[in-house]
Design a protein with these regions (language model features):
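Hydrophobic anchor at the beta1->P-loop junction of P-loop NTPases
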Residues: 31-33
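Short beta-strand-centered segment that lines the nucleotide-binding/catalytic pocket of NTP-utilizing
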Residues: 54-69
């Protein structure tokens, strides 16, 4: 699978990298974010949102659990939803199921999920075409190593020229 690494020396650098990477996303994509408290998950999503043309302020949905924004760019994603989901407070499968993740995944937009390790409580695979894992690893006061790995992509289209 495909992977990319980047060393960020500041929150602004993390946002800029995420904004640039956002331009490569396709419809029906889920981005799973992993990292300790304060590692920069929300900062990364803020940059992702900026790269998708979201102009509203992007804040962590720790208490509301989900925020929805409308993607403005690139053209292949324009008008689709960007879901920012924070699973930090989720402790049980029942809590996870009340979020309506099935409905979110059916909307074919982009879902960015903080504290993605909590998805293990869900007990089923994610019904999405494109799945990315993003690990944010602090290596200094402001420095972060960002590792992005493609976890799942749709099979190549069948050859219909025969």
């Amino acid at each position: 699978m495909t992977s990319t690494e980047f060393v960020s020396d500041s929150p602004a650098s993390t946002e800029a990298f995420a904004a640039q990477w956002a331009q490569t996303l396709m419809p029906d994509t889920t981005v799973l974010l992993y990292g300790d408290l304060g590692a920069g998950k929300t900062t990364f999503i803020r940059g992702l949102a900026r790269g998708l043309g979201v102009t509203e302020p992007v804040r962590s949905p720790t208490f509301t659990l989900t925020h929805e924004y409308t993607i403005q760019q690139p053209p292949n994603l324009r008008g689709l939803p960007l879901f920012h989901i924070d699973l930090y407070r989720i402790e049980t499968a029942a809590q996870l199921h009340t979020l309506g993740l099935d409905e979110i995944f059916e909307r074919s937009g982009v879902a960015a999920i903080e504290w993605a390790e909590r998805l293990e409580l869900w007990g089923e695979s994610l019904p999405v075409a494109h799945l990315w894992g993003v690990r944010l690893i602090p290596t200094g006061d402001a420095e972060r190593r960002i590792v992005i790995e493609c976890l799942q992509k749709p099979p190549a289209a069948a050859d219909t020229t025969r």
